[in-house]
Regions:
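Adenosine-nucleotide cofactor-binding segment
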Residues: 1-27
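Structural motif corresponding to alpha-helix initiation and N-cap regions
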Residues: 1-4, 30, 53, 84-85
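Rossmann-fold NAD(P) dinucleotide-binding segment
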Residues: 23-42
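Rossmann-like dinucleotide-binding domain for NAD(H)/NADP(H)
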Residues: 39, 46-140
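Structural alpha-helical scaffold elements that stabilize or flank donor/cofactor-binding regions
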Residues: 6-10, 32, 90-91
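Alpha-helical segments flanking ligand/cofactor-binding loops in enzyme cores
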Residues: 5, 34, 54-58
Length: 140
């Protein structure tokens, strides 16, 4: 990971698509968030354990980083626990976080809906309007 810390210091957006492995678990932790710019945005579409859960929550809550787009969660609802939250920490309540469920491309129909919904929601976001299809809104 030569140069990784330098990239974190300079990047507006940091995208992780990493799998969970012994070498990647907790790679993004408090030390890495300390390196990131105050307006930097973390985007995680890989696996949640690559980012230290509590450290991410604290960095976002304290506005240490600008925000996060999170497509992978630390917990998922199950038949035994249908109300399970995406994290042990109320990340979904923070105003600098957008969370999406990591379940895209399940069918042709869902792919088509996504191609319609994503641009519509980007337009709504730009206009300051409420987003469609919000899974958790504030006090979940």
């Amino acid at each position: 990971l030569d140069g990784f810390d330098g990239l974190l210091r300079e990047s507006d957006y940091v995208l992780t698509t990493l799998p969970t492995a012994p070498e990647t678990r907790g790679l993004f932790d408090a030390a890495k968030f300390n390196l990131m710019r105050g307006d930097a945005v973390l985007i995680n579409v890989g696996r949640a354990p690559v980012v230290a859960e509590e450290d991410l929550y604290n960095a976002l809550r304290n506005k240490q980083i600008g925000g996060a787009f999170i497509d992978v969660w630390y917990g998922y609802p199950t038949p035994e626990d249908p109300e399970r939250k995406p994290s042990r920490y109320p990340i979904w309540e923070l105003d600098n976080v957008i969370m999406t469920p990591h379940c895209s491309s399940r069918s042709d129909a869902s792919r088509e809906r996504r191609w319609m919904t994503v641009p519509r929601n980007l337009d709504r976001l730009a206009k300051g309007e409420p987003l469609e299809n919000v899974a958790f809104s504030g006090a979940a």
